[in-house]
Amino acid sequence: MGFDIDSQKICSDLESSDRRLKTTVLDELLDKCKEATNSESADKIADVFDKLYLHLLKCYEDRFESVRSKAIQVVSAFLSSLPPTDFHLMNVVSTLAERMGKAETVEPSEEIRLLYIAQLNLMICLYEKMENVGVFRECYPLVVKILIKSIKDDYPVVQREGCSAVVTLSRLADTQEFRPFTESILLPLYTMLNHKHAQARISAIQAIARLSLHMDASGDAMRRLFNEVSPLLMDTMPLVRREVGQMGILMLMELLDRYSFFERILPLVLCCLKDESPEVLNHIYPQWLKCGIQYFNENEAELSQQEISDLPVENYPKDVKRPTIGCRGLVQRSLRLLQLITRETSDWKDNVRLHALKLLYQFVLHAEAAMTAKFFEIYGDLAHACIDHVAEVNAEAAKVADLMGRLLSYDAWIDHGFDGLERNARESYMRCFYHMFTASLGGTYEQLMRLAKLLRCTDYSHTLKPGFQHYILKLLNTIVDKTLKINAGQNELEDLYESVYVCAIKVMALSSSLENVGDEDVNFGQTLIEKMVKLLNTSVPKIHERWFHLALQDVINLDAALEDNAEPVMLLNGLINMCHIRATYVHDLIEKVKIVFQHCCDSAQVKIFSSLSLATLFWSKTMNVERESSTQMLSEFVSQIVEPYLTWKAGSNAEAMRSLAMATLCALAQGAESESVEVLPSLAKYMPSLLEDRNVTTRHYAIKAVVYFREMSVEDLKPLAYATMQRMDDPSAGIRILAALAMGKLKPKFAETDTEENYEKEVWDAIVKRAMDLLLLYHESPEKDMRAAVAVTLKVLAKSHPEAWEERYQRALPMAQKKDLLTELYDKLTINEDSHTEVTSASQD
């Protein structure tokens, strides 16, 4: 079908006030135009459009929305069918500017505003095909007004179409001609960066990226551009972050003055290389390699020489691909940005700190040893980031420190690292140094010794911070591991291990004394000591005996009114709990404890005494000396630590100390059973009063200790026996039962001469009879446990004193309230005795 129309009739119909007529005409015209695209010549279509375009453009202002919409579609159809020409350009653009380029919103319909900006985009694309046709530049003021209005539109689709038009225009515009308009377009685009729709933010970034290639780089506009776009590197949507990286790639490849802005462009790309989303990394990384190739080609003379001597890094991190020499060169010329990056690691926003550390990681990865000179500048900020309260942030800081330890020149940074530790005895510097030092391959004997001595000093090893303690132990473990790779004599290694041991045992002691802290650090320290034991070919007890006294010497400032939570008290308490009491340092330990008892507060005294009482349970296991020496040391310990507190004194603290002294004595009797036989008799004079003490705990430990008073004469044991019998009437049921059991375990040592022996036996028989009377009395007790304890003791006494048992039974039987129970007990004990006699006779036969 031909494109034959009655142009005059169409023009007349378009001027009609009948909406239906105009829409019908426009529909027919649109259909014919679409059909003519493939069947009619361009000249024919152009001839028709020349006759109609003024009336069509006039319809843009029609009061009916449907007419305006159809008119725009018809004009766009004609423009699409026509060859590239600027004949109608000014008229169409002017009309669009009237409808879309004013400050106020002239066109109320969102859909028609979208058609307007789509038509402008179409015309820009057509202009691109016209190559060097200069009429369009005359339209820049009008076009820019339309674009700005579209970007500010409330309708997101219109905004995105406007951004698309900006991108298209930026691709074909001449920089010198278009530059005056860039800043006015950028302003609404910056506002659009905060749009709630991710797709709108992406469109804005694309437009800004293209406009940046035309900007005047000499002013503040470029600085503002980076400030506005950079926050989107932390956008929640991966596609937005990817677009920011794409903008960086575009500027690295095409920006004329890119060398001046490498420091600001690189973060846009490097952050995407550390992005957690694969779709960001996989899109940006190949293009980043192209940037490196371009930079290498532009600086081939310099980089080719560097490439020749570019050896593989020995300690490169696993699963990390080394950047190309071109990419590394790009970053190495932009190290001035590090100060800005490290400053952001202290920002109040969590995501900003994390973003800065990820960026710093990429800088270290690309700069490698060239970054060594900047280490001292960023050491403090990175150290602070290592103790960030957000786990994800401090984990990223640890990765950066690890990478720095691997890639930076060890000999150049190690002295700065030590200097930071010496000046700043804080957990932050410790963590940072640990990650760097552990990851590095360096470490001489002198450096390891210097580090071990530094950690041994009170500023480090006496800390009460659990996190600090943990990293001290980890750094000590690193020192031990690195000793396997150094050249040092056995004596030198032993000196080094000595410092490591002393530091480790102090940290473990303090860690064990802290409340609400697990055993993780203590267990880790034990593993560390066991590792040293293997290297020294010795045992854990021997290493304690050899070096523990050095740790004890570091417990200072005890001569003050310290509470139980004071660091010196906690250290001494932890040391006692960790290693107990050993022969090599028992004298030093006694002196330290005496100072505590003399000067420290009540709570501190009680705490130390409690630990001592537990430690004495292991006396026979930890005292690796002959029995005679062990007995002598036990006697000294008891006389100086325990005995002074067995006598009664007024006051709550004195009462607590008396209880603990009795507990310690009881523990010693169990832990040093053979040695206590010789030591305890001298303390028998205190026992009667202790057995009658007002404090139930004191009486409890006293009655438990009574049975360990052995090898004593009848005269010395007699007061203990009667005091023990009195405890069978104690208010505490537990003490009554223990007293009943204790009477069967008291064994005197009789005199060697017959006369004295007979006399002492008579005295002891009287004591036994008295005990039997009491036991028979308590056998009628309603307490089941008490009756059982009485039966056990009577069985022992009846066996050793049968005549006395028979006599006391006959005496008690008439007075017994429950004769059947007493008779049953008598029969049971007598049967046992008879059966025992028969078995003995049979064995003799």
Curated annotation (Swiss-Prot):
Deletion phenotype, per the entry, is: Homozygous deletion-mutant flies are not viable. The larvae are smaller but do not display obvious morphological phenotype. RNAi-mediated knockdown in sensory neurons affects flies movement coordination and impairs hearing. Testis-specific RNAi-mediated knockdown does not alter spermatogenesis and in particular the formation of sperm axonemes but it impairs sperm motility.
Q: Where are the HEAT repeats?
A: 47-84, 138-175, 180-217, 260-297, 332-369, 523-561, 674-715, 766-803
Quote the tissue specificity entry.
Expressed in testis.
Location relative to the cell: Cytoplasm; Dynein axonemal particle
Q: Spell out the GO cellular component terms annotated for this protein, sorted alphabetically and separated by semicolons.
A: cytoplasm; dynein axonemal particle
In the UniProt record, does the keyword Repeat occur? yes
Q: Give each disulfide bond as a residue pair.
A: none
**PANTHER family from the xrefs?**
DYNEIN ASSEMBLY FACTOR 5, AXONEMAL, DYNEIN AXONEMAL ASSEMBLY FACTOR 5
Q: Spell out the protein name for this chain.
A: Dynein axonemal assembly factor 5
Q: Which UniProt keywords apply?
A: Cilium biogenesis/degradation, Cytoplasm, Repeat
Any one Gene Ontology BP term = inner dynein arm assembly
Q: Which gene encodes it?
A: Dnaaf5
- A Pfam match is HEAT_DAAF5
- Domain of life, per UniProt, equals Eukaryota
Segments spanning the bilayer are: none
UniProt GO MF annotations: dynein intermediate chain binding
Q: Does the keyword Cytoplasm apply?
A: yes
Similarity section: Belongs to the DNAAF5 family.
Task: Briefly state the protein's biological role.
Answer: Cytoplasmic protein involved in the delivery of the dynein machinery to the motile cilium. It is required for the assembly of the axonemal dynein inner and outer arms, two structures attached to the peripheral outer doublet A microtubule of the axoneme, that play a crucial role in cilium motility.
